[in-house]
């Protein structure tokens, strides 16, 4: 459960990402594919080479979904319901992949926004991404 401080940290930090959300989302995806090659199995139709337009486009989709979630921290289940259905029933993504992508996103964000990525912000973002992962895997049961 996100505390009021967590919510403030997440909203404030996410606001500092600005127009880079898509760029950072794509970088996090590419980082995940390189670090955890088994995650590539869900993207057989993608060009997975460095700088791929498909990775960038999907990274933007991921980042846009997270931006929506940041705007609706009080109702993550409602905000992410369609994505949860899609990943559980149609795409059948292994739930562990959400944790892997969350980790790669934290690494990416910390590398770009070092000054703002304090231990407190790190903890809040980790809790936020964990909450998102929990919602996205809720329809698997």
Swiss-Prot record:
Residues 1-141 form the Globin domain. The modification Phosphoserine is found at residues 3, 35, 49, 102, 124, 131, 138. The modification Phosphotyrosine is found at residue 24. Involved in oxygen transport from the lung to the various peripheral tissues. Belongs to the globin family. Heterotetramer of two alpha chains and two beta chains. The keyword Metal-binding applies. O2 binds at residue 58. PROSITE patterns: GLOBIN (PS01033). Keywords: Acetylation, Heme, Iron, Metal-binding, Oxygen transport, Phosphoprotein, Transport. Red blood cells. This is Hemoglobin subunit alpha. The modification N6-succinyllysine is found at residues 7, 11, 16, 40. GO terms for cellular component: blood microparticle; haptoglobin-hemoglobin complex; hemoglobin complex. The modification N6-acetyllysine is found at residue 16. Gene3D superfamilies: Globins. GO terms for molecular function: haptoglobin binding; heme binding; metal ion binding; organic acid binding; oxygen binding; oxygen carrier activity; peroxidase activity. GO terms for biological process: hydrogen peroxide catabolic process. The modification Phosphothreonine is found at residues 8, 108, 134, 137. Heme b binds at residue 87.
